[in-house]
Amino acid sequence: MSTEPVSSLALPAPAILPTTPIPASTQQASSLVSDQIQEASTASQKSVTSITQPPIPSQQQPPQHITANHPASIAAAATVALSATLLNPNEWNALASTSMVTLDDLRSAFLEQRQQQLKDLERSHRESLREMIFMSENYDKEDVAGSPWKLGQSLQVAEDDAREHVKSFLDQHRLALDPKMSIKDHILEQPKLLRQRVSQELKTGPIELAPPPTPTSATAPSAGEAQRDRDLKREIEQNNLHRSQAVARAAAAVQAHAIAEGVAKIKPLTITAAESQGVRVAPLQPGQVPSFVIESTTPIAHIVASSDSSTAVLVASDAQKVDSHTTMSAAEAVTPAIKVESTDNIDASPSKASHALEKAVSPVPGLARNASTQSTSLRVPPSPMVVPTIPENITAPPLHPTLQVLAPNPLSVTYAASLRPLPPDPTRRITGAGLSGGAIHHRSGRKITSLSNHSNVNSYSSIAAAKIGPAGSGQADLYRWYVRARASPGAGMVGKADKCLMTSDWRVAFNEQRFVRAMARIEKLKAQGEWSFRQPKKQKGPVVRKAHWDHLLEEMKWLQTDFREERRWKMTVAFHLAHEVAAWHRARTPAERAQFCVHVQRSYRHRTISDNVEQHNTDKLSAKEVVSSSQPFQAAAASLDDVEMTHSTSSSHIQKDGEPATVKAESGQPVEDADVTMDGGADADEAVTQAVESALQTTNEAASARAEEMDADGEDDADTDANDVEAATAALVSGEPSKPPKVEVVREPLSQPQPMPTLADVSVPTTSSATPTVPASSTPTTAANDKLVHALRSQPKDADSTLTAEMPPQLLATLRAPIFSTSVTTTVVSPAALLDSLNPEAAAALLGIEVSDLANAADLLEPGSLSFSKMFPELPLYGGVSLPESNSKSDRRWDEGSLNQPPRLTHVTKLLDSRPLLVSTLEPSKNRANGRWLADSDWVVAAEQSDPLRGVTDGADTALPPMPGSLLFARKSNRAAKDASGPASTTPAEPASPDARAALFVWTPDEDNYLMTLAKQYHNNWALVADLFNSTRLNTATDKREAWDCYDRCKRIEQAAAEGKPPPGPPPMPAPAADADKDSKKGDGKDADASSSKRDKLSKKSGSKHDGSKRKQRRSNLMEVMRRSAKRREATKQAQQTQQTKKVNLNTHETHAQIKAGPAITPQSLSALKTERDQAALRQYYEQQRAQLAYQQQQQQQQRLLAQQAQAQRMAQQQGTAGTSAPAATAVTQAGKAGTAIVAGGTGGVGNVSLLPAGTPAASAGPAGQAQQKAATGQGTNQAIAQQTQQQQQQPQSQQTAQMQVQQPPAAAAAAQQQQQQQVQLQSQLQASQAAQMQNLYAQMQQQQQQQQRQQQQQLGQAAAGLAQVRPGVGALTQQQLATLTPQQQQQYHAQLAAATAAAQQQQLRSQMAAVAAAQGGQAGFQLPNAQAQAQAQAQAQFQLMQQQQQQQNVMQNQGRPAMAQQAQQAALQMYQQQQRQAQMRPPQPTQPFAARPNARPGTAASSQAKPQAAARSATPAPPMPATVQALQQQLAISLATSNLSAEQINGLAIQLYKQAQQQQQQQQQQQQQQQQQQQQQQQQQQQQQQQQQQQQQQQQQQQPQQPAPTQQRPPPQQLLNQAIQALAAQTQKNQQPAPTVHGVTGSPVRPPTPRPS
């Protein structure tokens, strides 16, 4: 160390830093993630990470500094901080391996983490953009705060900056999937002032920019190291995310000091020594990442070179690639100030430093640090990374003593490197630690590769998923599985399963038990010391020479490869030609089409050899004269008999002067190098003609000689070859032989191309466009080309001669990088072009030599020394098939048991294939950390040195034959083999007792399938089939199938398949002959049980005679136990049958409904029983409520009846006083009342006739009355309701007329009495007609009921005849009939009965709704006094009908009810019936008098009676809800309570009715408005008519004042009655339309939901 003071670094503490700036490591990680998302964000991140100068804290809060003078203290701080901040996933793995964390929790955590990462990425991206704006504005300003000379606390633009260009920049380059503008389009000006300032301070020459590296970095490793480098890079980036800013700057400072001072200056330093030198550890707060804070109180010193220092300092700076046409911008900041010492005071010069140190401290790994000492300029190489990567390739120290003992020679190390990795530790798999333990010889980073597959390497869930579970474990741990299977075996779960299990489920449990027993056996053998983990190597057998068959197979494989590749080549050519033709047709203009064409000379007609021979037989003399001059051409033609001669091979080069020149025979130049042009008008050249004739003659002779040697099968090939040669030479001949063509040879100058040999084999023909022609006169160039071509030939002797020993992999990667950037259609690669693209300085740096020394290594970088096999040593080179030499062809047969082939022995564990190595030998405490082996441990370094390719051989061994596995014998069609179903080639020997032998084995379906597969595959080679069958299944020594067993089983299966039957089972065990004779001697009187027992005993004895094995004995015992259990089961069944009582079986002759007893009670049936019990309790509650309500209603009706009687007496007294004053009006009123008789029908068709008061006179019913009776008799429910409504509307008119008559003068008393008598007679007649009508209706009802009963009896008879299906319409069955039914038939009967009851209830609900609508519709007008009684009578009829319909249901339902519930229900029904009878017996109430005008006349009453119904309805306000509606509501509640409808169905019905009511109410309101308008018009007209009538009556009274009132002409009562009946009939026909709505409820049927069957 120099005695001069070393400059220190001022690094602020992260604890006091504001949260605004983002650390460089975070920005670097953000750049890594955004590189996968968007290219724009990548460029911005790279531009941001170019800042290497740390921010200085604000002046208001000066930090406390601690001096650290030694760079080793900084290295110690960085090392400790890195080890402290590494992630430890043990806790996460332990949590995820338990049941506390579910898959949903992991998914939600992963989703939250991804969302947070996206937010952080967007935030960091915007901060990076603001920093980029700040940097672009202030990097070249010296006096502005924020420039490299005056760094502020924050290096970014404020978030609230409102400048327009800032907003537009942030908006253009925001983070998005569809960016509008890339960050590459943002051009940064070159920092010229900054470079000048740096050059002035460093006292160096002008700063130059180093050229950018090749597309693939100079440090691109080989294929074997690429994966390790990527994994290591990802791990470093993951750790950098959790580093602090101080640690990153400390690492950069350590690198800078290492560059200046050399590797010898950095010594290991402990944490204690570091603390003594000024390094302190920042206090760790909860949730804070630990970091080291290194600060200094001394100001930053600039780099000043010593007087005797001539070493150029390389200052790292970051640059950004602006565009492909722009240069690289310089760095915006420099590294911390470093004191540069003189080279004399440095112990280890940088020029003499090792290559590993240069690569470690270089910002761009791979570039040399040994620049020329005479250079005064400063070279700034591009460096996109602020924090350098950890040195990877370090010079290996000497081997550890233990390693030297274990590995005395490289051969043992190579053997250890080829071994497989050690198995993992089962006890440490749960926490994730120790995963892939002992993996020091991994051929690929197994653990890191699994982690690198995830999109985010920092994701805790990704790490946990990779380390936990079968998917991420990588290796199966049998011991762990064995422990878990013993703790919770699947067989126990299968045995207690409550669901249906398939055969595969049972097979899983069976296999698990087999494996558990196998593992238990292994553990037992381990305990006894009989289980070995070592397997001796197979002894190599004697050498087997190849036979003729082996050579024939090789030739067949070669032919197969040739044919397949030729077919692929033809398909490829056809593909390209088709696409080119399609492109030519798509071209629109001739110019575009001309670009697809190649301008060649016109082709000539091909002539056959025979024609040429006939034409030239006459010119043999002239041909002989020129034979001596055409010998070179003959030699060339003889050597190229089988080579196709293209136009380019027969063309020669042209002279420069362009003058014609003749071809002379004595010049010696080959004719194939002459470019001959045919011209009919030119003179013939005699020499050319002779040469052509000589060529034809030589070709014919060669063809005839070859045809004689070939057999008949080769004649076609000979003709084809001759045609090919003739096609190349016939272009020179045209015309008759007596007149040779005129040939003119023209020579024109061609440009001399640069020699460019192709990287291909000579045996592969190349086209003229790919290989440029070389002049024949240039002999040195041709020789060089021949040398290069032969050098690139892929021969077996050159397979191992690669440049890996002389040329490093980095240089190879750089050299072959341009190959990957070429087009996919390029087929020729020039080595010279590759060498020209290589940078000499980069090549010198990679080779570790000076640029001036590259001339000495020219032999390595010559075009002739490059080939594909040398540039790609790790890849096999595919080339043409070359003929092997006679002595190189191996005559040894491929040994199936060699070490290169996988053995046929069962692979139990990986320890059998690996050399045992104790873990303590590896020293895990020193060489293992954080679950993986350290890269710089002695074992890893030794393994890499001994075997860099990690077991991958460097090139294939050409002496060995190709690996087996050819597709030569693969069947390419789906047709079966011809001999698949034929007889066996060799039938095995039949045993002594084949049937007994076949009965010993039980074949499972899987075994049958496997046996048939083996038989088809090995063509009935039964010995091999039996061997394979026994070796691939777990069996005992006694359960071994012989060849005959396999043959017999296949034969039986084929016979069964031919007959269309399934595979047969084992045949029965034959009985011995002696026992059979004894059985035959016995009589047939024995029962079946005795004979079966005898047979079982005999089979047992015969079974015990076979071999006396334990398996036979166990089988016989099992059969005996099965026989006894079956016998015991039969005895128990017979005892149960005798105990049961005999019942009449109605299904004796029923063959279609043989159904067994019902299954056990299911949860659904239990819930149904519970529902029935709850419904019964609910019905009982409602019955009690109804009984109480009926009692209350009875009391109220009695009180109301008393009040009505008292009121009737008072009204009678009032009528008696005023009755004498209006006899005429009373008569008219009574007549009107008689005409408004109403016939009301119930819902079930029962008509209840409401009679008028007894004082009304009767009248004979005329034809109109009879018609009205018939119409009323035939009407249904809706017509009856409409008649009731009409009656209620007509009633106020009669009452008004009666009131007007009451107030008439007393002069008409006599007439009133007479009128009253007539009304009494009329009333009696009306009552008689109504009684007759009721009798007719009652008779019709009885007829309908009788018809229904007959139908029910018929259906019941059908059900009794065939009880397979119970009809819904049948009535209730008796207990005897139900007892005869089976349980399933009873269930079916109950379901159908419930459906029929539900249908009846729905019809009843519809009728009740119609009745409610009718009663409510008549509520708006005046009602008769006895309307309530009529409604109650109608409700009574409805209730009776409902009671009749529910009798069938109650028969079954009441059986399950308790006696108290039935009695309560009967009492409630009786009370309700009594209440209805009392309501019918109640007398009618008298009408109340109305105030009439004094001048009222009989005509006025008539006119008022003729008023429409709507006027009376609109004039009278609506009274409260009548008793009729209440009764109907009560009846509806009773019906719902007695029904089986659930609460949900009732609510649904109510909602449906409510919606329909709303819709219909709106329609009714609209209709009412229209009717009101029409009624108003009619009223106006009637009023005018009434006024006219009144005026006429007054005139008549004035003219006849003395005439008494009874003498007026009035219609007789019979006419009034007929008019009333006609009006009622018309109104009835009008009401046949849908009934009017009452609060939205219509007479239309509303179908409730179908009730559930009980």
UniProtKB/Swiss-Prot annotation:
Residues 1061-1071 have a biased composition (Pro residues). Component of the NuA4 histone acetyltransferase complex which is involved in transcriptional activation of selected genes principally by acetylation of nucleosomal histone H4 and H2A. The NuA4 complex is also involved in DNA repair. The lineage of its organism: Eukaryota, Fungi, Dikarya, Basidiomycota, Ustilaginomycotina. Residues 7-26, 49-64, 628-639, 980-993, 1133-1143, 1449-1482, 1500-1516, 1570-1608, 1615-1629 have a biased composition (Low complexity). PROSITE patterns: HSA, MYB_LIKE. Component of the NuA4 histone acetyltransferase complex. Residues 536-611 form the HSA domain. The gene is EAF1. GO terms for biological process: chromatin organization; DNA repair. Residues 1-66, 204-229, 609-679, 693-720, 883-902, 974-993, 1057-1159, 1257-1304, 1449-1523, 1570-1654 are annotated as: Disordered. Keywords: Activator, Chromatin regulator, DNA damage, DNA repair, Nucleus, Transcription, Transcription regulation. This is Chromatin modification-related protein EAF1. Residues 995-1048 form the Myb-like domain. It is found in: Nucleus. Residues 1097-1115 have a biased composition (Basic residues).
